[in-house]
């Protein structure tokens, strides 16, 4: 078996990488603006990189919100979240950045973002951020 380095024959960047790089959160009109209701979204495969070691950090993101005029389109949200996979960023900074983008794009009545980071080096971390006023 040859030990020569195999050349990558695929074109760079791959179409999936381009789509992720260009991603942004897209919203569409709330189909029932008169009703107060909650939507929960789970994103169990969030990844970013530790800004100090460069090692990957993994988390489960849970978003619960009460839509106002818009709701989040799920595929765009998935691609937006996947864009963080190669970014060196602290847990605190990335969760706050995601929350800012969610609030700015969707303008929900109320939103809660929970990020449960997997243990690394015997330490796990969970962040909870809220914005707006919850309605009953």
Curated annotation (Swiss-Prot):
GO terms for molecular function: preQ1 synthase activity. Coiled coil: none annotated. GO terms for cellular component: cytoplasm. Pathway: tRNA modification; tRNA-queuosine biosynthesis. InterPro entries: GTP-CH-I_C/QueF (IPR043133), NADPH_dep_7-cyano-7-deazaG_red (IPR050084), QueF (IPR029500), QueF_type1 (IPR016856). Transmembrane segments: none annotated. Signal peptide: none annotated. The keyword Aminoacyl-tRNA synthetase does not apply. Its EC number is 1.7.1.13. It is found in: Cytoplasm. It holds the Pfam family QueF. One of its GO terms (biological process) is tRNA modification. Catalyzes the NADPH-dependent reduction of 7-cyano-7-deazaguanine (preQ0) to 7-aminomethyl-7-deazaguanine (preQ1). HAMAP family: QueF_type1. This is NADPH-dependent 7-cyano-7-deazaguanine reductase.
